[in-house]
Amino acid sequence: MTKFVKKSEINCKWYEIDAKNAVVGRLATIITKIIRGKNSPKFSPHMDHGDFVVVKNIEHIKFTGNKFENKKYYRHTGYPGGIKETTPEKLHQKKPEEVLKLAVKRMLPGGALGKKQLSKLKVCLLYTSPSPRDSVV
């Protein structure tokens, strides 16, 4: 008989990750595993029992090769001919935290569960502890 974890049995931890000189994709895979709860032996894909992740020094994140200048992010406004594109370089100048959030978001499942799990990612430019009552592991 399969035993499932109840909501009352879930204890979320806080992880602090330093992104200084980290590669975006490699860091995003580590964060995604923690947020989804895949590092836990009680993982089940239909439940949210992942941990919180705080990422600091996000302004020092990097890409390998020429992806920082050449990679394209596409989005659509919803209007005819409304495709917009930007590079990580331009996005990093405006919102440095958005580069990592996009990478993690695209590794999570699409839907309500993915949105809930993405809210467990906290990206800090000027680092302050997001939850003083919880200990950061």
Predicted regions mapped to residue ranges:
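Beta-rich strand-turn-strand
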Residues: K95-L100, G110-A112
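C-terminal structural segments of small proteins and small subunits
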Residues: G114-S119
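Acidic, Ala/Val/Gly-enriched low-complexity intrinsically disordered segments
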Residues: V136-V137
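Conserved small/polar residues in nucleotide/adenosyl-binding loops
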Residues: Y127-P132
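Charge-dense, helix-prone N-terminal extensions
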Residues: I30, R106, G110-L113
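Ribosome large-subunit tunnel/peptidyl-transferase-proximal elements
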Residues: M1-G78, I83-E98
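Short, structured helix-loop element that forms part of the nucleotide-activated donor/catalytic region
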Residues: A103
